[in-house]
Amino acid sequence: MIKLKNISKVFNVSGKNLTALDNVSLEVPQGQICGVIGASGAGKSTLIRCINLLERPTSGSVIVDNTDLTQLSDNELIHARRHIGMIFQHFNLLSSRTVFDNVALPLELEKTDKTQIKQKVDALLNLVGLYDKKDVYPANLSGGQKQRVAIARALANSPKVLLCDEATSALDPATTQSILKLLKEINRTLGITILLITHEMDVVKRICDQVAVINKGQLIEQGSVGDIFSNPKTLLAQEFIHSTFHINLPEEYMENLSATPKHAKSYPIIKFEFTGRSVDAPLLSQASKQFGVDLSILSSQIDYAGEVKFGFVIAEVEGEEEAITQTKIYLMENNVRVEVLGYVG
């Protein structure tokens, strides 16, 4: 449904060329949700704006629904954009129009019959859960409600593609989850292909089928969410995944944690990261029995990304130095990532 081929975008800033996108290729199949994740300034917003040619690429092809948008005339492009909805971090609602009238605006611009407009807008407001707010003005809505109005408006022309530009970054966590749930429902019920950009891996984890990691204008890693979470190949992808872990060690451990052992009775605090089959296997208990070490679990978290289970355990590991070393080797051989956080004792 969306195919980017060798997209580059160069801006001229004060007489100097600034490369925002460098030979980016990406494909999103029909009906899937793809997340593009990267830090601020990585090129995410430029990338998504190239898809509907709000930013025209310096080079490369943008193919949406088998049509290369870069080859269209201005009038043809206007027509093609009707099939591409877009929502933004800031909702861009018209304060002088009610919820109903904001959603109706794209249809009015198309000179749609008033009866059809009412039927369409009522259906969309039911879909986003705001039918009872149809006569309310944006000033009297919460942030989450405003984003729901923006989503309904983006769907007014029955697009085949929905672009989401940091659509949840201005929302609180609970509202973010409700908007993500709505986007997933829209994807399932309407079959709309969704491409979203974000700097939050939690967003990707919750609703995406595939993910692409962008850094300094280049896509450095892409694949299914399950594959990326279970086997991230780049340091940046690993860092984004680690950001979804909420590590809480007891305060007494944090205060006494040292980078190196202070004496013979200092024991390591180790983080064990599990993905896929290693999550369900009793590897820690097997290692404890086999090598004679004691593991005191201090913190743990298990979650899902796509259909892949992943998580971590942080434990104080007590035993002979050689036994602890063998424990780490055994777990790494069974696809567990091992990181010594420090020493206590």
UniProtKB/Swiss-Prot annotation:
GO terms for molecular function: ABC-type D-methionine transporter activity; ATP binding; ATP hydrolysis activity. InterPro entries: AAA+_ATPase, ABC_MetN_proteobac, ABC_transporter-like_ATP-bd, ABC_transporter-like_CS, ACT-like_dom_sf, MetN_ABC, MetN_ABC_transporter-like, NIL_domain. One of its GO terms (cellular component) is plasma membrane. Residues 2-241 form the ABC transporter domain. It is an enzyme of class 7 (translocase). It is a peripheral membrane protein. It catalyses: L-methionine(out) + ATP + H2O = L-methionine(in) + ADP + phosphate + H(+); D-methionine(out) + ATP + H2O = D-methionine(in) + ADP + phosphate + H(+). Its main location: membrane. ATP binds at G38, A39, S40, G41, A42, G43, K44, S45. Keywords: Amino-acid transport, ATP-binding, Cell inner membrane, Cell membrane, Membrane, Nucleotide-binding, Translocase, Transport. It is found in: Cell inner membrane. The keyword NADP does not apply. Its EC number is 7.4.2.11. Belongs to the ABC transporter superfamily. Methionine importer (TC 3.A.1.24) family. The complex is composed of two ATP-binding proteins (MetN), two transmembrane proteins (MetI) and a solute-binding protein (MetQ). Part of the ABC transporter complex MetNIQ involved in methionine import. Responsible for energy coupling to the transport system. This is Methionine import ATP-binding protein MetN. It comes from Histophilus somni (strain 129Pt). The lineage of its organism: Bacteria, Pseudomonadati, Pseudomonadota, Gammaproteobacteria, Pasteurellales.
